[in-house]
């Protein structure tokens, strides 16, 4: 995997907590390496093959060009016609990993882009600037919501330059309120009847400061009825923290990029977790280990 010009909350907190981990990417996942593991943690990923939809603002930067070169080289080496096909294969491998009993935890754009990649398996939502061929006309009608874990009835963005995959994300709603008022609230569960959600929501506070991301949180109108919402902001109509089962395994989606950096921009320095030893937002990541 290429080093990206932003921090990764998952590897930051695993490193800070001295929890050993291996790093895998497309080649290893397609090569069935996931079978060697029980837990898979993801962060700011794009499973649709649109390179995070950074084209408008960053396509001229060296890191973006390298990401495209590396991804196209990997796709070619693995026998795929284009990057989006490789990313779909990766998404399906992860789904099989969960079905077989694995645990998936993913943050930021690794949530909605993952669901969308699975739902768009039978169509082409990537425009020319991403995969060198046009989108399929009327691709929205071919979105199969049943294939994804968490979301349904959403509309896919048709603008290749928009920094958004669909209308699942609630980021725009957060732009209208002051940072100090941006919160989400954890649900309380019975340790007797809801053991896993109870563990995932353990914290010293139920009120947690919000934080932005490419995917900040999820509009509840698009969340499937069988998905467990563990943290939300009812006033905004958004959920931040989701959990569900699939096959023999489970998955958790956590919106936002960095729990201790309200707006983490490209090229910002990584967060120093030694300054935030009791971070409730980072605690939720550690609960998923």
Annotate each PLM feature.
Residues 75, 98-99, 138, 264-272:
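Flexible glycine/proline-enriched surface loops and loop-helix/loop-strand junctions
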């Amino acid at each position: 995997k290429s080093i990206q010009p932003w921090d990764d909350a998952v590897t930051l907190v695993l490193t800070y907590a001295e929890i050993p981990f291996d790093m895998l990417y497309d080649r290893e996942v397609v090569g069935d390496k996931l079978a060697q593991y029980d837990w898979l943690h993801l962060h700011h990923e794009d499973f649709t093959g649109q390179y995070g939809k950074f084209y408008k603002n960053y396509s001229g930067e060296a890191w973006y060009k390298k990401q495209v070169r590396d991804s196209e080289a990997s796709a070619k080496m693995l026998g795929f016609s284009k990057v989006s096909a490789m990313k779909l294969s990766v998404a399906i491998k992860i789904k099989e990993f969960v079905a077989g009993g694995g645990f998936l935890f993913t943050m930021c754009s690794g949530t909605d882009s993952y669901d969308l990649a699975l739902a768009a398996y039978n169509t082409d939502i990537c425009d020319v600037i991403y995969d060198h061929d046009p989108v399929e006309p009327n691709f929205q009608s071919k979105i199969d919501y049943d294939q994804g874990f968490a979301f349904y009835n959403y509309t896919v963005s048709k603008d290749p330059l928009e920094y958004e995959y669909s209308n699942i994300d609630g980021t725009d709603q957060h732009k209208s309120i002051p940072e100090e008022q941006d919160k989400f609230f954890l649900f309380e569960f019975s340790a007797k009847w809801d053991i896993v959600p109870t563990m995932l929501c353990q914290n010293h506070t139920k009120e947690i400061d919000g934080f932005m991301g490419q995917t900040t949180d999820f509009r509840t109108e698009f969340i499937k009825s069988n998905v467990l919402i563990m943290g939300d902001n009812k006033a905004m109509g958004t959920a931040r923290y989701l959990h569900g089962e699939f096959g023999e395994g489970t998955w958790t989606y956590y919106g936002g990029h960095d729990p201790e950096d309200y707006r983490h921009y490209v090229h910002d320095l990584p967060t120093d977790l030694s300054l935030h030893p009791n971070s409730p937002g980072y605690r939720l990541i550690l609960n998923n280990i």
